């Protein structure tokens, strides 16, 4: 940064509120600009970024992933997995023994949380993605 710019910046830092307001008015008149237009542009940037965060929060489909099943808990987890997935005994057993596996894709938030609670109560480690 040049010395001239640094000096101007230091002078601006030393202004009180009344002097800063007077400076803004003088700049508006001298250069025929509107300082409120600059702040309006910044206000418009905020709503643009808000929908992006709203989209993240609006996730409606979740995957329920069976991460781990301890050996002593396999039978109790198997009893929960069968009615949740509609699988037969052999298929459910294979699924429980080959973790990590996706149990259900595209489940609603309520269904995913219910499945997670039932499986965790049976002793499994579950992740909802």
From Swiss-Prot:
GO terms for cellular component: chloroplast; cytosolic large ribosomal subunit. Pfam families: Ribosomal_L12, Ribosomal_L12_N. The keyword Ribosomal protein applies. Keywords: Chloroplast, Plastid, Ribonucleoprotein, Ribosomal protein. One of its GO terms (biological process) is translation. It is found in: Plastid, Chloroplast. GO terms for molecular function: mRNA binding; structural constituent of ribosome. It comes from the Eukaryota. PANTHER family: 39S RIBOSOMAL PROTEIN L12 (PTHR45987), LARGE RIBOSOMAL SUBUNIT PROTEIN BL12M (PTHR45987:SF4). Forms part of the ribosomal stalk which helps the ribosome interact with GTP-bound translation factors. Is thus essential for accurate translation. Belongs to the bacterial ribosomal protein bL12 family. HAMAP family: Ribosomal_bL12. Homodimer. Part of the ribosomal stalk of the 50S ribosomal subunit. Forms a multimeric L10(L12)X complex, where L10 forms an elongated spine to which 2 to 4 L12 dimers bind in a sequential fashion. Binds GTP-bound translation factors. This is Large ribosomal subunit protein bL12c. The gene is rpl12.
